[in-house]
Amino acid sequence: MQRWVKFAKYLPAAGWQPVVYTPENPELTTVDRTLAAEIPPEAEVVKNHIFEPYGIYRKLMGKGSTTDLKTLTAANAVKDEVNPINGQKKNWKQKLSLFIRGNFFIPDPRVMWVRPSVRFLKKYLEEHPVDVIVTTGPPQSMHLIGLRLSQATGIPWVADFRDPWTKMFYFKHLGLTSWAEKKHHRLEQSVLDGATRVIAVSPLVQDEFKAMTKTPVELITNGYDEEDFKKDVELDENFNITHTGLFAADCNPETLW
């Protein structure tokens, strides 16, 4: 999410006025309320009430209320971020939730957003036309919103992939049936072929998508906002690498070897 918060922050300087569409009542494990201040005053923020089953999932898994990053400590970060979609031993609740998540909510639990969002945004765009639609995923359901909106309106659409879809490391841990796996691949292909442009976050993902579609696939890697790092950093004699994101047993950063 931070990726497009920062894009929205700097797009006005490039002559673009962003319109941000976001749920009015999302279900999240953690929130960073400081990010709202990053949205430029030129941007219009459009919200819509949605339904998603994640709240039910959290209760089933025994997870508590949403955690504000201001109060997040190292201890509860480890506790809250135990990811059942990896090689860890899972209890029956985790196994059941993974099976339901992978086979009933395709491509992800946010699929419940798609129809109401398309219906809402079609009406919005009739009164407030835009030059281009941009979706970012995961959740990959956001790309289904972009696909349907672009098909209905003819507006060019850019699909930004912050992670791959069916080649994501945890995809094989979802316990997919043959039918569900085929549907994932079919939806992924429809997004890649239906987009005006596809953006990948790494050369590897870019190459994978290029082999799958004739749609132009551009590369925009993750970066950082210099305003967030104004303080001078004193380096020591050690060589340090910071990895910000998931690093599971399935991940193999071959470039480092």
Where are these regions (language model features)?
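Charged active-site motifs of nucleotide-sugar-dependent glycosyltransferases
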Residues: D131-V132, Q140, D236-I241
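An aromatic- and histidine-rich active-site surface loop
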Residues: G102-V118, I133-T153, A159-R162, K167
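Carbohydrate-associated surface elements
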Residues: L204, I220-G223, L235
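Conserved catalytic-core segment of nucleotide-activated headgroup transferases in glycan assembly
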Residues: D225-W257
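Membrane-proximal helix-turn-helix segments that form the acceptor-binding/catalytic region
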Residues: F7, A14, R119, S141-L144, ...
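Conserved nucleotide-sugar donor-binding subdomain of glycosyltransferases
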Residues: G64-V132, H184
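N-terminal subdomain of nucleotide-sugar transferases
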Residues: M1-T67, V217
